[in-house]
Amino acid sequence: MRQILFAAAIALTVSILLTPALIKFFAKQGFGQEIRVDGPASHQSKRGTPTMGGVAILIGMWAGYLGSHLIGIAYDAEGPSASALLVLGLATALGAVGFIDDFIKIRKGRNLGLTAAGKYLGQLTAAIVFGVLALQFRGENGLTPASRHLSYVRDITTVSMGVIVFLAFVSLVVVAWSNAVNLTDGLDGLAAGSMSLVLGGYVIITFWQYYHACATKPETGCYNVRDPLDLALVCAAGTAACIGFLWWNAAPAKIFMGDTGSLALGGLLAGLSITTRTELLMVVIGALFVAEAASVVLQVAVFRTTRNRLFKMAPFHHHFELSKWAETTVIIRFWLLAAMASAFGLGLFYSEYLSAVG
């Protein structure tokens, strides 16, 4: 428990102090956000706001995680684990893809960076490498960071995948979550605030899995998850890093996370869902991100079939803006939706445990 608090404290401190330094540096370098020309007119005033703030989130997460382990040496805590390093590595790899995308946008002075094919190639490469490595590193309890079963709150043993199908599934999960968070990052503080609520829920889930781990408590309802406590450190560091960044990203934003941050955070969710054996539960807890992505898919599908638009603009947070909701109203209400989804998901998680223990 102490390490979780240390991870959060360090990540929060690094993120909240590093972000203003990045604001000054990026502003000096002219690294400003380009705004989509077909977006809400009110967003044009945001043109030139420093972007790529996701760098602060990533550095904050790594600092919190590694710093908590350095402190843990004092009381003989276990060192970094394969599961946590793989999840952080996936987030960092996708953050690198986002950084390249952001940099191209800035250099070309337009809201178009990497081509769709180039972005998907980067996402798929990161996903496949993660998937391959996640089936390695068998721990003392015989568990690998990932399993080839589909999972809800724990593995669904009746649904097993071969290696190729598993890698395809991991690729789908990674691409879907990274793009979902990317689409949500369209209003000041929306993605960072929503992400802190989702990751906060996962701090509880991973700590519960640690407390009821089959490796230490082989009892009814225990969890077969490799390194749950270390994954809790990642979740705590991620939550705190997002909150620290949100201090400067809240409306009116002084900096945007850019694709650097949104792709990284989406990768973090994907990696956590796989390593904690909660792939289907993550859809519930991260329902806001799912809804944002679904709104884009529905908008395209309806337009192609009927030539009419389902929403005034997609992702659907823009629909509410164009319906005369103030930007801050949309943001706060969406945060509330994210909080409700996280709470509902935690309720499902706990109810499954109660059912398992009889």
Swiss-Prot record:
GO cellular component: plasma membrane
Membrane topology according to the record: Multi-pass membrane protein
Keywords from the UniProt entry: Cell cycle, Cell division, Cell membrane, Cell shape, Cell wall biogenesis/degradation, Magnesium, Membrane, Metal-binding, Peptidoglycan synthesis, Transferase, Transmembrane, Transmembrane helix
Enzyme Commission designation: 2.7.8.13
Enzyme class of the recorded protein, top EC level: transferase
TM region positions: 3-23, 54-74, 84-104, 114-134, 156-176, 187-207, 231-251, 255-275, 283-303, 330-350
Pathway: Cell wall biogenesis; peptidoglycan biosynthesis
Record carries keyword Cell membrane: yes
Named cofactor requirement(s): Mg(2+)
Reactions the enzyme catalyzes: UDP-N-acetyl-alpha-D-muramoyl-L-alanyl-gamma-D-glutamyl-meso-2,6-diaminopimeloyl-D-alanyl-D-alanine + di-trans,octa-cis-undecaprenyl phosphate = di-trans,octa-cis-undecaprenyl diphospho-N-acetyl-alpha-D-muramoyl-L-alanyl-D-glutamyl-meso-2,6-diaminopimeloyl-D-alanyl-D-alanine + UMP
InterPro entries hit by this protein: Glycosyl_transferase_4 (IPR000715), PNAcMuramoyl-5peptid_Trfase (IPR003524), PNAcMuramoyl-5peptid_Trfase_CS (IPR018480)
One Gene Ontology term of the molecular function aspect: phospho-N-acetylmuramoyl-pentapeptide-transferase activity
Family matches, as Pfam families: Glycos_transf_4, MraY_sig1
Cell compartment(s), UniProt: Cell membrane
GO biological process terms held by the UniProt record: cell division; cell wall organization; peptidoglycan biosynthetic process; regulation of cell shape
UniProt family annotation: Belongs to the glycosyltransferase 4 family. MraY subfamily.
Its biological purpose: Catalyzes the initial step of the lipid cycle reactions in the biosynthesis of the cell wall peptidoglycan: transfers peptidoglycan precursor phospho-MurNAc-pentapeptide from UDP-MurNAc-pentapeptide onto the lipid carrier undecaprenyl phosphate, yielding undecaprenyl-pyrophosphoryl-MurNAc-pentapeptide, known as lipid I.
Protein name (record): Phospho-N-acetylmuramoyl-pentapeptide-transferase
Source taxonomy: Bacteria, Bacillati, Actinomycetota, Actinomycetes, Mycobacteriales
